[in-house]
Amino acid sequence: MMEVDLLYFEKKYHNCIVAGIDEAGRGPLAGPVVASAVIIDNANIITGIKDSKKLSKKTRELLYEQITSNYVWATAIISHTEIDDINILEATKKACSIAVANLSLEPEIVLVDGNMQFKDERFVSIINGDNLSLSIAAASIVAKVTRDRLMLDLSAELPQYLWHKNSGYGTKEHIEAINIHGLSPYHRRSFRCC
């Protein structure tokens, strides 16, 4: 298999300030959606960064600390209630836009994982971007760790839903817990699950 150059898109826009953005939490039945934006420093490449889903929890946590200590980054969180109000796609797009707006450095190009379309012309959608862009991969790590930590806190409040294990996703055990205990205040009412 051919090695992917994770800096291809960053090099393509080498004269620009480039941010990568990714989200965590589009599919779960409970909790917020989180988007993170990261501007990497091409002179200080952190090794091991790749799509958060391909990393162990321990490695994600270590890389999160390195990314947030060395790069410009920002995160936005959209609550489960707002997801229900505006739908998950619009909530995700809103989180992405807020995360970019919260960066301390204004990007000229924003690489976005997936195929979402934005009115802001700086946004460039890249399907499978978390496997093709180092900036997006770094953002995927920050978003996932941030959301997992939020769900861990919620799990301490409502342990019966096992969010410390499932992060709010519709696992068999989570759906069984909903059937036994009903929906919690943190479940998305617009997601029909059981």
UniProtKB/Swiss-Prot annotation:
GO BP term, pick one: DNA replication, removal of RNA primer
GO terms under cellular component: cytoplasm; ribonuclease H2 complex
EC supergroup of this enzyme: hydrolase
Binding site for a divalent metal cation: D22, E23, D113
Keyword Isomerase among UniProt keywords: no
UniProt entry keywords in alphabetical sequence: Cytoplasm, Endonuclease, Hydrolase, Manganese, Metal-binding, Nuclease
Enzyme Commission numbers on file: 3.1.26.4
Main location: cytoplasm
Catalytic activity: Endonucleolytic cleavage to 5'-phosphomonoester
Cofactor(s) named in the record: Mn(2+); Mg(2+)
Primary role: Endonuclease that specifically degrades the RNA of RNA-DNA hybrids.
Similarity section: Belongs to the RNase HII family.
Protein's name in the database: Ribonuclease HII
Organism whose genome encodes this protein: Rickettsia massiliae (strain Mtu5)
The encoding gene: rnhB
